[in-house]
């Protein structure tokens, strides 16, 4: 929401428009079938592939430093979108990273500077900053923890990722409440109405979210909120519009459910205003998708898939070989991973990105040339599908 507020402020100052084609500000991006407008990006309807998936697929775990320039370079190579802009809504970390660069080019200031000058300093948010320097010491920074099994709790030491946009805000619950008062208090800013206007798809269908904010309802009360999730930490800032109560939660436990904690606080302090609890007050997790069953293949059958393949979209080489009767792939310099056959020319594998995404599940389908030999394959993971690889040897 800080990125959305920054964009809204620049819009009000006439320095940009949400109707702008993003290529006005980021000409490095491809010209897709339909232009991506800043409106699409701020409302998560751009269709841009998620860089948090693309980098692990390229053999770049987030334990390695990633810069905004590298993210822009990665996105400039993407030949396709997940969907046409404005047709669907899907949360996009990429869009907000690129919006940070739009802010920099429109204002002449990096996002961290802009936020400090326009928001943090004037509002007395002295404990808040956009983390843009991995060597910077942050006084009183809480250590994050993640759990690896029931009894294995570990500290999280990944501070190489220092590119603000979709995250990297260090703050306190007190400062979050100062921000909430700024947005919703009696002296609310001129951008207040724009920030809280519900977005729509291109066909006019409402999205249930405004600019960097979710619009919802809990037990009869209208809510405005956004959650945060990063290495060993979870957070939420939620406002109950009536009776005008804000709840800020910050956890240094990577498995904490900050949203559920906010609801528990509301249950206690707003009991008189809430309607009786029902069965569908909170979103339920979707059931885990079942993995396709393995299909046995002989050594000779697996051998036809061996070799090196290159993707210009990922700027990465995948090298396949057969080891002990199993097909394995080495992505750049990473350790070999088993690739499990699940059908005709179709395989699946998993890779680890412990710094952020955990386990990334991927699938691929090999493509054959006119003579029947394997010529390449299409790689996919989650919403990111159709990433092309061509045989090198």
Residue ranges and their predicted role:
Residues 1-6, 97-101, 173, 178:
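Short amphipathic alpha-helical face segments that pack within enzyme cores
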Residues 36-39, 126, 242-245:
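Loop/turn elements at helix/coil->beta-strand transitions in domains of secreted/extracellular proteins
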Residues 19, 38-39, 112, 116-120, ...:
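Short, well-ordered surface patches within globular domains
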Residues 46-50, 79-81, 124-128, 150, ...:
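Generic structural signal for secondary-structure transition and capping sites
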Residues 104-116, 121, 153-393:
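Catalytic loop of the DD-peptidase/beta-lactamase superfamily, centered on the K-T-G motif
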Residues 27-35, 68, 119-130, 200-206:
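Short, mixed-charge aromatic SLiMs
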